[in-house]
Amino acid sequence: RNAGQSSPFLRTFLEILELPERSCSLPAVSGILSSEPVRNRYGLSEDDCRVITAWAKEAGIRTDTGLDSSRSFSRLNSFSYGLERMMLGAVMPSEDPYEEAGGEVLPYSSIEGNGIRAAAMFREFVRTLSQAVSDLRTKRTASGWQSFIGSMVRSLFSTKDYEEDFMLLTEAVGDMAKYSGAAFDLSGKAPGDPLIPLEVLRTFLTDRLGREPSGSAFITGKVCFCTMIPMRSIPFKHIFLVGFSQD
């Protein structure tokens, strides 16, 4: 298995890159929270994550209408409304929390004791993830993506025990920065520092992190970088010559 499949850190990172174009459903979001590097970042255990998911379901959370492109769910089923219910229920000891909340939001009253901290961490995680998903939709230069990804990883992941995976991700983003200098836009103009959309970043990193770790993976991907010597024949339909000098 390649690094992108076997590493919880890299696998979860790639899942986050897909969120801007897919439904931000409760199963998708809770799956990200339950991954070890993310839950460790927020000081949560596996049991905490299971309980949080149960609370979220009971509070009516289904999807985030602010992130999901579909409108099949109302605001009452959004993360923002469900989290408001959860936090109001946690802090209001009144026998009639609905009346105390002004009658606008029905507090979810099953959270108490040590569960209040877990609920607060869940709210912080959802807010951070929501901001990251929104920011991922912005085109950036390669250097801009380097800075953004570093910041996003620090805010959502614990890199403890995953230093090698984080280094692999950093190297992959660095490689994209090197290649982007030779990129051409659709007009045929070669920009010095082109803006790169999320789709290009995601495709590049998925391919880069999905490569086999050994040299035996030659000619197994969609693009192969190699010399033409000592080949007797070149087994490719399309050949692009890069880096030729006058010599």
How should each PLM-predicted stretch be described?
Residues 1-247:
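Polyanion-engaging groove/track-forming segments
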